[in-house]
Amino acid sequence: MANYTLAPEDEYDVLIEGELESDEAEQCDRYDTWALSAQLVPSLCSAVFVVGVLDNLLVVLILVKYKGLKRVENIYLLNLAVSNLCFLLTLPFWAHAGGDPMCKILIGLYFVGLYSETFFNCLLTLQRYLVFLHKGNFFSVRRRVPCGIVTSAVAWVTAILATVPEFAVYKPQMEDPKYKCAFSRTPFLPADETFWKHFLTLKMNVSVLVFPLFIFTFLYVQMRKTLRFGEQRYSLFKLVFAIMVVFLLMWAPYNIALFLSTFKEHFSLSDCKSNYNLDKSVLITKLIATTHCCVNPLLYVFLDGTFRKYLCRFFHRRSNTPRQPRRRFAQGTSREEPDRSTEV
């Protein structure tokens, strides 16, 4: 009788204990992204915002006032700086209280800036390849600038259309009694919607990583085949390629972490320790990726001698008479810069 009554109780106790252990294991080491986000996001994003806005506004000033917009690459570089500014404008507002409309506006600016930057990086690389392939004669000067304006408009429209799904399905995270525009958690993943979760993650991976990586790799290989007979010409493409490489290097870790986090069931990463590592890696890699907007102006300074010259002129005001240096610089740019594109 005792055995009959104790055995079920023992078995029942074991089952309860196993369930509790399972629940504890499931929740034991879940990484609290809100905690680290509250510590790092406000200070880091504010610093990146200040530095990035100042740097990119300086780039816009140099391009518009000194270098001019009579070359297609300058038009693309200007739009690239504007894309960075759109991205940067969202950073101070992450992890702060805000309603649904405010968060959706931030999401829209964030992804429009990110996608447009990807497109302009690809356009810059493609433009330099076409200039080299056709030795500067594939378009007349009169046709190049309108073509640059049209392709820039198409890139912006495409970036806006690509952002519509994120804008439509985003829901702000609920924390305590307030809504927060969450930076730490992937902002465009709607709750309990597996299809949208997979679709938007794949769209992010393809748009920001796979597509530009394919464009860059293909064009780089094609150009290297021809440049082996004239390595000196390769220096003309350092700036454009450096911008693309830095963009890919800074966004690749986040895209990989996001992909693994979204499809963790397919990679046997659903255990508690893997969830902890994935949540942590998504947040940290995203924080690193947001700093990319501050890097492009540094590349201009280190790799573009003309930009450095205009930058020194802007800060030091070396010219004695304002008109003659302007003519001299204008003639220098019209003689030197178009020659670079035609020599290639």
UniProtKB/Swiss-Prot annotation:
Name of the protein this chain belongs to: C-C chemokine receptor-like 2
Intrachain S-S bonds: C103-C181
Gene transcribed to yield this protein: CCRL2
GO cellular component terms, semicolon-separated: cytoplasm; external side of plasma membrane; plasma membrane
Function: Receptor for CCL19 and chemerin/RARRES2. Does not appear to be a signaling receptor, but may have a role in modulating chemokine-triggered immune responses by capturing and internalizing CCL19 or by presenting RARRES2 ligand to CMKLR1, a functional signaling receptor. Plays a critical role for the development of Th2 responses.
Residues passing through the membrane, by range: 44-64, 75-95, 105-125, 149-169, 199-219, 239-259, 282-302
GO MF term set: C-C chemokine binding; C-C chemokine receptor activity
Cytoplasmic side: 65-74, 126-148, 220-238, 303-344
Protein family according to the UniProt entry: Belongs to the G-protein coupled receptor 1 family.
CDD domains: 7tmA_CCRL2
Membrane topology field: Multi-pass membrane protein
UniProt comment concerning the protein's domains: Lacks the conserved DRYLAIV motif in the second intracellular loop that is required for signaling of functional chemokine receptors.
Compositional bias segments (type: Basic and acidic residues): 334-344
Keyword set, alphabetical order: Cell membrane, Disulfide bond, G-protein coupled receptor, Glycoprotein, Membrane, Receptor, Transducer, Transmembrane, Transmembrane helix
Glycan-modified residues: N3
This protein's record includes keyword Transmembrane helix: yes
Region (Disordered): 323-344
Extracellular side: 1-43, 96-104, 170-198, 260-281
Subcellular localization, as worded in the UniProt entry: Cell membrane
GO biological process: calcium-mediated signaling; cell chemotaxis; immune response; inflammatory response; positive regulation of cytosolic calcium ion concentration
